[in-house]
Amino acid sequence: MRHYEIVFMVHPDQSEQVPGMIERYTATITGAQGTIHRLEDWGRRQLAYPINKLHKAHYVLLNVEAPQEAIDELETNFRFNDAVIRSMVMRVKHAVTEASPMVKAKDERRERREDFAEAGDDVEAGDSEE
């Protein structure tokens, strides 16, 4: 089986349907004896340029190892699902399991925010003791 990186963008009005779509697509892959190495839901993001007069979309990234039949079925599902506005399937040489730069940046921002909040709590606690 080959390794693939799959990114698809969902219409922003259909964002609440994304978990069901992810479940359906992962079931397609695992049903064909494929494995999912990485699954990231990036959420709603600004598009670089308008697509069908839309300026935002809900992004999902999958890194999978699957047979060609499963990938063909996924591409067909993307094509006939009106909620999916764009999709891209790329073959990669090996499985990618580490977090993408998008998720790493989000985690770093969250850690900085938590550190700042803790530092603020320490300062407030120190002021009240005096």
UniProtKB/Swiss-Prot annotation:
One of its GO terms (molecular function) is structural constituent of ribosome. GO terms for cellular component: cytosolic small ribosomal subunit. GO terms for biological process: translation. Keywords: Ribonucleoprotein, Ribosomal protein, RNA-binding, rRNA-binding. Residues 100-130 are annotated as: Disordered. InterPro entries: Ribosomal_bS6 (IPR000529), Ribosomal_bS6_CS (IPR020815), Ribosomal_bS6_sf (IPR035980), Ribosomal_S6_plastid/chlpt (IPR020814), Transl_elong_EF1B/ribsomal_bS6 (IPR014717). Pfam families: Ribosomal_S6 (PF01250). Residues 104-116 have a biased composition (Basic and acidic residues). Residues 117-130 have a biased composition (Acidic residues). The keyword 4Fe-4S does not apply. Belongs to the bacterial ribosomal protein bS6 family. Binds together with bS18 to 16S ribosomal RNA. NCBIfam families: S6 (TIGR00166). HAMAP family: Ribosomal_bS6 (MF_00360). This is Small ribosomal subunit protein bS6. The gene is rpsF.
